[in-house]
């Protein structure tokens, strides 16, 4: 198991904001203490500006250095452009590791799946998974799927990949919930699985299984996973019902696809996040 992380991603914070450095630091500590899963630690690779511009406008890239909040959820931080690029570099490094047959997880912040071509929003500044998916397509992968199990709809990823013939997007998320999108399938390649608040755990898992089966029918050559852990039953930002065992099962299910796969951290705001990530990684690794 390869974990990609960087101290820079714990260098910024905002008082009272749920997307905080401890999400990373406490998970690192948990993963370093455990002995069941051998881990190789590495740093992000370089961030390719051309890769960013496949997914985002130059206006957004320029906007990242202007000292003005994007919205109340997405404040400006000094050097946020550098931190966002480090997350992109980790996503691109994860893609390369998956191509080489490794099981890999990017333990980085900021997350990315709400960022659209022209807008940073929802704690997200650049869309890491969309950038990596388009990079894969640009470098010879014929079909790329993005599987997003964050409890919030990946509106940014959907908008960037919409109607791209080489890509498919699958999002399983709570609705109603932020950002208020994802109620139906969109275009020819974006498939949404909205789940009502407080859906019973078994029903939620059934929806996840249906989405995995649908993804398999697309026959991708690469899968990028937006791994959000906020559908957890005790996450403060939603009303999900999943437990650690369900994230383990989901990791197993994705592993069983038998397709090169990379996972990038998105949401998850409970103090139990390290346990949830470890459970998912064990499933991915077949432990």
Predicted features, each with a name:
Residues 1-287:
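HDAC/HDAC-like amidohydrolase catalytic core signature
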């Amino acid at each position: 198991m390869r974990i990609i992380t960087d101290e820079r991603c714990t260098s910024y914070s905002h008082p009272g904001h749920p997307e905080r450095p401890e999400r990373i630091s406490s998970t690192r500590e948990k993963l370093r203490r455990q002995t069941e899963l051998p881990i190789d630690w590495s740093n992000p690779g370089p961030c390719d500006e051309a890769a960013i511009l496949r997914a985002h406008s130059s206006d957004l890239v320029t906007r990242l250095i202007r000292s003005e909040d994007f919205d109340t959820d997405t404040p400006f931080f000094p050097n946020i452009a550098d931190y966002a690029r480090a997350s992109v570099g980790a996503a691109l490094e994860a893609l390369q590791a998956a191509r080489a047959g490794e099981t890999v997880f990017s333990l980085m912040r900021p997350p990315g799946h709400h960022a659209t071509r022209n807008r940073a929003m929802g704690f997200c500044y650049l869309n890491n998974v969309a950038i990596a998916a388009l990079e894969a397509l640009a470098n010879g992968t014929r079909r790329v799927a993005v599987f997003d199990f964050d409890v919030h709809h990946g509106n940014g990823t959907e908008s960037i990949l919409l109607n791209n013939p080489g890509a498919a997007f699958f999002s399983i998320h709570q609705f109603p919930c932020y950002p208020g999108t994802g109620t139906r399938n969109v275009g020819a390649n974006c498939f949404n699985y909205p789940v009502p608040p407080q859906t019973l755990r078994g029903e939620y898992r059934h929806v996840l299984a249906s989405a995995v089966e649908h993804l398999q029918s697309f026959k991708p050559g690469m899968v990028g996973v937006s791994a959000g852990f906020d559908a957890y039953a005790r996450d403060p930002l939603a009303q999900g019902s999943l437990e650690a065992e369900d994230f383990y099962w989901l990791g197993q299910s994705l592993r069983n696809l038998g397709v090169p796969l990379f996972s990038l951290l998105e949401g998850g705001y409970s103090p139990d996040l390290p346990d949830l990530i470890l459970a998912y990684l064990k499933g991915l690794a077949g432990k």
